[in-house]
């Protein structure tokens, strides 16, 4: 088998990386044409790697060396003499990512696209070409199911379980007065839904909102802007447990503390 490894540079990753290389000694490390991609790190590193290496039909294996591991199926303790046999017996599936399109660019999002504005700049939201609301406030988040345990959760969004493929929109600190009232609740939309944000050119460039795709700032000019969103299948295939119990266990170990 041909493989490629992407590893974070954290101290705790290095021993796991060496262990993985030893386990894969009968496989061939290559730069192109790989069948497996191993991503060693936390969820943040996994997200940034996926954005750059969404390869056709390759199998992506996440090995957690960070604190949170919603996107990883293994940790360093799993890298034993049975690892390869377990790995080759697993089912890998494509997952839904959020495709983001602007006038000149198209890219994929695993967690969320975030819009921030410090001037409560108006953003018109359309759902399947129907005007939903004219939002004013600190910003907006939009993302697929996979992002519901990331920034969306911190913004009081819904935690969405596996096998529920939806798009979620969350308002951040909406501006409210008698003539400006928005929904103020997370919106969950079916996977086929097309969402569009429309923003007019600002009088001053510094008033125009800032846009971040999975934490990376987008270079969008101060002009009349339309950004569309829709779920699409990834090109890569992933192994991550879709069992309710496994997801609950991760949620409890990460977020829930009770005596």
UniProtKB/Swiss-Prot annotation:
Catalysed transformations (reactions): NAD(+) + ATP = ADP + NADP(+) + H(+)
UniProt-listed Enzyme Commission number(s): 2.7.1.23
Gene from which this protein is expressed: nadK
Amino-acid positions noted as binding NAD(+) in the UniProt annotation, renumbered to this chain: 43-44, 111-112, 136
Localization per record: Cytoplasm
Family to which this protein belongs: Belongs to the NAD kinase family.
HAMAP family given in the database record: NAD_kinase (MF_00361)
Keyword Cell membrane: no
Pfam families assigned to the protein according to its UniProt record, in alphabetical order: NAD_kinase (PF01513), NAD_kinase_C (PF20143)
Biological role stated in the UniProt entry: Involved in the regulation of the intracellular balance of NAD and NADP, and is a key enzyme in the biosynthesis of NADP. Catalyzes specifically the phosphorylation on 2'-hydroxyl of the adenosine moiety of NAD to yield NADP.
GO molecular function: ATP binding; metal ion binding; NAD binding; NAD+ kinase activity
Database matches in InterPro entries: ATP-NAD_kinase_N, ATP-NAD_kinase_PpnK-typ_C, NAD/diacylglycerol_kinase_sf, NADK
Catalytic residues identified in the record: 43 (proton acceptor)
Gene Ontology annotations of biological process type: NAD metabolic process; NADP biosynthetic process
Keyword Cell membrane attributed: no
Cofactor requirement: a divalent metal cation
Record's protein name: NAD kinase
Keywords associated with the record: ATP-binding, Cytoplasm, Kinase, NAD, NADP, Nucleotide-binding, Transferase
One Gene Ontology cellular component: cytoplasm
SUPFAM superfamilies, sorted: NAD kinase/diacylglycerol kinase-like
């Amino acid at each position: 088998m041909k493989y490629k490894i992407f590893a974070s540079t954290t101290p705790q990753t290095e021993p796991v990386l060496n262990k993985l290389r030893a386990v894969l000694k009968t496989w061939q490390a290559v730069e192109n044409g790989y069948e497996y991609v191993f991503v060693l790190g936390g969820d943040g590193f996994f997200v940034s790697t996926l954005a750059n290496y969404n390869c056709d039909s390759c199998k992506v294996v996440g090995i957690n060396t960070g604190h949170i591991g919603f996107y990883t199926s293994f940790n360093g303790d799993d890298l034993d003499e049975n690892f390869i046999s377990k790995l080759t017996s697993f089912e890998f599936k494509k997952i839904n990512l959020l495709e983001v399109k602007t006038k000149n660019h198209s890219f994929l999002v695993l967690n969320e696209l975030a819009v921030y504005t410090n001037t409560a700049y108006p953003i018109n939201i359309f759902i399947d070409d129907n005007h939903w609301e004219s939002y004013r406030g600190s910003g907006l988040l939009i993302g697929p199911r996979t992002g519901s345990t990331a920034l969306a959760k911190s913004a009081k969004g819904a935690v969405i379980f596996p096998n529920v493929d939806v798009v979620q929109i969350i308002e951040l600190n909406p501006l409210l007065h008698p003539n400006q009232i928005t929904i103020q609740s997370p919106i969950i939309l079916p996977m086929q839904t097309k969402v569009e944000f429309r923003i007019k050119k600002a009088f001053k460039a510094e008033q125009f909102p800032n846009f971040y795709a999975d934490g990376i700032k987008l270079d969008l000019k101060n002009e009349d802007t339309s950004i569309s969103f829709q779920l699409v299948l990834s090109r890569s295939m992933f192994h991550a447990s879709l069992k309710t119990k496994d997801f609950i266990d991760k949620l409890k170990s990460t977020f829930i503390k009770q005596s």
